[in-house]
């Protein structure tokens, strides 16, 4: 069905009257936003019912995508775009007396994620829906998200991200489908006629109330669902305590339940934080598995065919408890024997690994499981025991290998090993990452079960990250290769036919210039910074982590600043460095790097020598809606992680799609970008992954520091500090001497000279505008391989074994 401007106007005014008791003349901008959202939600809900009925009629295998994060961004424009009603909606809003741009702009980013993991999940939901795969995403309905970042005196301050008051219009509460989760208590078991009987007593009950967010696909009536679980206590407040004036105590149990869905990634450097994180993860997977199995039984009457009709994809290790929880339901509730339950589980669950960093491969203390999840602990010990026997048999009792591969070892529960033991497939997210998993991180498991290990290189929603956010580039692509690129991203390759067309190259440059000016206006409105739009926009935006090497970028800027101070009259191409990053609240070093970047920015931006030449701006509270403004305006994409440390990256793909050129290491998906672009269309530098691995054994950054006066001068600036009087000697020590870690753990000093040289090559290339635009065009044309549609097709073909719209 098509919807006209008149249809939408009528539906919006009806929502305003029925839900807010007001006319369009009386409505606030917030009420207008929510009314628009509810109108689109109704359209999607209707399509959603039809999509689920169709899948049920066909007996289709369903995909269940579990992720602790879904970084959805704003949904009003995206849903209107996918439903093919965006122009009509904009006109309807304007004719009702509102500015459409203001209404779209006031929508908060949904606080359901943090970084690349969550954004990937959001892109994949869009592609699964567009490809008409019956799928449901599952996560937690966080009340306050991660946090809203404020920069105060150069330092990160975390504020609550209260997104729901304006963002909850997309949510459809389904209290009738509430699930009950049990924590703590004791477990008794007994055998009765050959069946294991399990009695769980004295547990604490928490309710998981589902709130569904409908997901529209592009150019299809198919709609999928993102199911978000909200934690509630089944107990009312204690009226006796309340009447005695003990108001806080009267609601204590309710508050303890509510806190489970309060924030994403609560700080876990103390016992209470660890306990809350584990509660979150079990709450999430238990509610999800109960919901999936309940729906399956309603349709098929048995769980014996569960694996034939369902596949559960777990995005990183956070949902790993889906394995013992599915076993619990199959054994305790459905009465299946262990072997049959294990066969079903290991043909239902697949695991995507997203990291090679040891600290990110989740490990939990045994005691937490024994206390919080006694029945799950029993199942885990049995899984571990049986898997250990399998390892011992295969490796002839090699206890070193057993120790590395075991699920439970030395009082610790290893979630990645659990995923490998209980999963039918394990995939990395770039060719290099998957190779490192096979050859290094999970080498022993791969030797034992080689067919389990796959690769699916990440991809991004190119409709959002080109067509929706960069309409000028979208128009160019439609003029040159046609609208087909929106559903078949490989057609973008056709743009290369225009690589030597003077008019097209000129247009590429004009598009970038206009986008830079738009972004500069937006930044000025947001934080008062005045960007030099005649300068190179050189951008590094991503989660703040030492391996991503924002500090190396800052050291290079110090080098440029020192050069300018030494010779104010030197030839210098104007250069604006843009940073955006959040540091985890408990990650002190990352917070210090943010402080350093802001100190450096303050020094440079207030030095007359740097005026109109060198500029540094830290973009506060980096988020999806900011990225949508920034990506089209960016000219240089910094992808400079230590080789072998970044699993894939998706920001690199979005920059490439928008014509930014990459300065980067051969890490993650940069490797595959290099395969399609070659040396001539990106600026590579630095050690390769195997060189990093080899050098680590003998690496001594102090020798580099002592032998190279220029390097020493740059690094010593950390001790000296800047005009604000803050010293960064702690970061200096971390690089030169080591502090609770090996010195220069991520090899910044080893790569810094090569990085500076790559930046010089980039600046020289920028001086030839026609050739730069040609390189930009080639990046755009060859980026189609990184579309999420391709990734989802790979999952469907190699892991899920489900059909999809070609």
Residue positions per predicted region:
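A conserved ligand/cofactor-binding region detector
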Residues: 1-806
